[in-house]
Amino acid sequence: MPVHWSKTGSGGVMQKEFTLGIEEEYLLVDRDSLQLAEAPEALMSTCQADFEGQVSPEFLQCQIEVGTRPHATIAAAREDLKRLRAGVSQRAAEHNLTPIAVSCHPFASWKDQHHTRKERYDALQHALGGVARRMLICGMHVHIGVEDKALRADLMPQLSYFLPHMLALSASSPFWNGEDTGLSSYRLTIFDNLPRTGLPPSFSSWAEYERTTGILVELGVIEDTTKIWWDLRPSHRFPTLETRIMDVQPRLEHALSLAAMNQALMRMLCRMKARNLRWRHYDRFLVGENRWRAQRYGVGEGLIDFGDRSLKPMTVLMDELMGMLSEDAEALGTLPEIARLRQIAEHGNSATRQRRVHAEALARGEDAGRAVVRHLIEEFHADL
């Protein structure tokens, strides 16, 4: 692995805990037609009663969002997220609906969807205009606890280097409006139409971050920093860094592996800082090229290793990353989860699997879009 780190000149105390939380957005589909369906009021109210604030409506009425509690371990997060997935599925079944965890429905039209009538979403629709109407997309967000604000600002540009890797592994949105887009993550194409998205800027300090974002807040351009939708951002509500670039995962275990990757990377970067080292900062333009490659090809064509200026297959990159993260994954108890990412790099991500199902259904003369949705339903329930 080429050297990507350099001396910082100042050390730091290693964090004792790297708590994590996972947020997922699901689509609701009718069990018979496999078309998108709006969440009945009774479904939302029972889910909210069952899970005490861990389930909420999303921008579109066909969406539902879940969020785990903060956890110190992936094992604890697994139980929480499994409980949420299973619970939402059981409640949805009472209305002949089922959730799927995918970033774009294979054949639904955004023109047929309606946004949730809440003051927050009404304001968003007004602010974003026609851009908001096309937001028929779902994502996955991972929060990692970082108590120190200065450390959050320091870690952001370092962790940004790995955002394309996370996107490549997670890509689950090859289809849009019934067509193969040629991309592995079409979700990002839609999301990037919003303002204040993409790779985060690099800030020299927490004070600079607050000054910069504060300009928009002070002028009334945005209400607060929740309206900043970078791929990675400091959370407005929690003392965390929130990774937002990933497509949502049909499989529970794949979601947990990506969360484990975030947690282990954060621990590795803090461990380096304690030794007066830091991951080398690469220009946003260069990391953006890897972001595009991940969006377009997923794990299929590899990413650029800027340390030795070469294109490398995802399997090679994951072998190198696993070597770097082994100490951290062992300390966190997540070696199996990190190893699963190597399997995704080798055998394909969700976009790969969806295209395979689509092609096989076409070869049999079946409705390929419906076959993909049935596949997504199976994957949602596979690990429960």
From Swiss-Prot:
EC number: 6.3.2.2
Transmembrane segments: none
Family annotation (InterPro entries): GCL_type2/YbdK_subfam (IPR050141), GCS2 (IPR006336), Gln_synth/guanido_kin_cat_dom (IPR014746), YbdK (IPR011793)
Keyword ATP-binding: yes
Function of the molecule: ATP-dependent carboxylate-amine ligase which exhibits weak glutamate--cysteine ligase activity.
Family from the record: Belongs to the glutamate--cysteine ligase type 2 family. YbdK subfamily.
Name listed for the protein in its UniProt record: Putative glutamate--cysteine ligase 2
Source organism of this protein record: Ruegeria pomeroyi (strain ATCC 700808 / DSM 15171 / DSS-3) (Silicibacter pomeroyi)
